[in-house]
Amino acid sequence: MKSFYQENVFNDIDFGLIKSYVFKHIESSSDFNYTKIYGRYWNTIDFNDDINNLLIKTARSGFDVDDLEIVYTQCVKYQIKDGVTPSLGNHIDDFYATHTLNIIIDSTLDWPLTVGEVDFPSLTNSAVFLKGDEDFHSRPKYPSKNENDYVIAIFVNFAPANSEIIKKSNRFKSLPKEVREAMRLKMTPNDVNLY
């Protein structure tokens, strides 16, 4: 298994900046929509350069890969809604990112990410440095029936700077904001729970 877990990934000041940005993003997003596939709200999030640079530095150091760049970052909030319970079936990621930081921003419960046979806790300011393209991962049965419980996380997806997906990602990011937003509204998550 190439994935690993780390608690207290960021110092208090840096984590506070990330957490504040995520909460403002969730509050102000018109497209933070709920998908019944996973039982979560989700969309993509564009951090400012300071936070992006911090995330890149953390990934490069943790994975020991010095040319990782961000492909995209997903913001999620797992929560029961209208009787739909969060779930994540066992799968390998089938997109072009090669490394993912799965960072817990806030949580009212511990709903671990299982990688291989190892459960990694959902603690605030912890991260799974995930080789999701190689390591099978899932989550166990959701541990609550309370609709007020939740897990807020970001999935920062990386690939080497010279990869084709980074070139495509950069072209997408260069499109006008309204075009990017219109395209994002049409994105549908892949249902890994079918596997």
Describe the role of every protein-language-model region.
Residues 1-63:
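Non-heme Fe(II)/2-oxoglutarate
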Residues 29-33, 99-104, 179-184:
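Glycine-rich loops and low-complexity Gly/Arg-rich segments
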Residues 69, 78-140, 147-175:
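Catalytic core of non-heme Fe(II) oxygenases with the double-stranded beta-helix
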Residues 174-195:
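Short, cationic low-complexity segments
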